[in-house]
């Protein structure tokens, strides 16, 4: 696994309110995630997503999350919401993911026995065009459950985000243990699904910066 000499990127996922997105931008978050997966408690309509999209600050990535959505649904989101990244949590194959001419991230579930068989070479063969990977506890995401970080593939050359039960209380240790390119949080900064907590958002960012300070400069 690569040891990044750079700061840890931060993605806040499951955003549903304009005010939460504005605060995320003010805190210096690198990306916000908008969910279009059917059945999610954080599901957005296209019109609601467009309203949120208009409030996103420059230099902040907008990530559209899908899980086994139809190509037509994804094309509509790409055309109207204009995400800078796509994120796939279902059974989508590489050929499908790259159909939309937008860089994509592939989520890899890590909680079950299937995770024991994941290896770096397999990921590269299955998703050769992925911009990066998200290692989450479950396929659906947003469960608030962690997984055994020692299961992460070794010698991974692509950027990867650590997700699954990441909170302000454990993100410092998570970064120290796995040195991810980025961390992805949803339920860990919420009052309830889709409703973010400003204090938790601030604390999460502070803990990531503290972890980077320790890792890069040896300061707490």
Swiss-Prot record:
Keywords: Amino-acid biosynthesis, Aromatic amino acid biosynthesis, Isomerase, Tryptophan biosynthesis. CDD domains: PRAI. Pathway: Amino-acid biosynthesis; L-tryptophan biosynthesis; L-tryptophan from chorismate: step 3/5. One of its GO terms (biological process) is L-tryptophan biosynthetic process. It comes from the Bacteria. It catalyses: N-(5-phospho-beta-D-ribosyl)anthranilate = 1-(2-carboxyphenylamino)-1-deoxy-D-ribulose 5-phosphate. The keyword Translocase does not apply. The keyword Transcription regulation does not apply. It is an enzyme of class 5 (isomerase). Transmembrane segments: none annotated. Its EC number is 5.3.1.24. GO terms for molecular function: phosphoribosylanthranilate isomerase activity. InterPro entries: Aldolase_TIM (IPR013785), PRAI_dom (IPR001240), RibuloseP-bd_barrel (IPR011060), TrpF_fam (IPR044643). Belongs to the TrpF family. PANTHER family: N-(5'-PHOSPHORIBOSYL)ANTHRANILATE ISOMERASE (PTHR42894:SF1). This is N-(5'-phosphoribosyl)anthranilate isomerase.
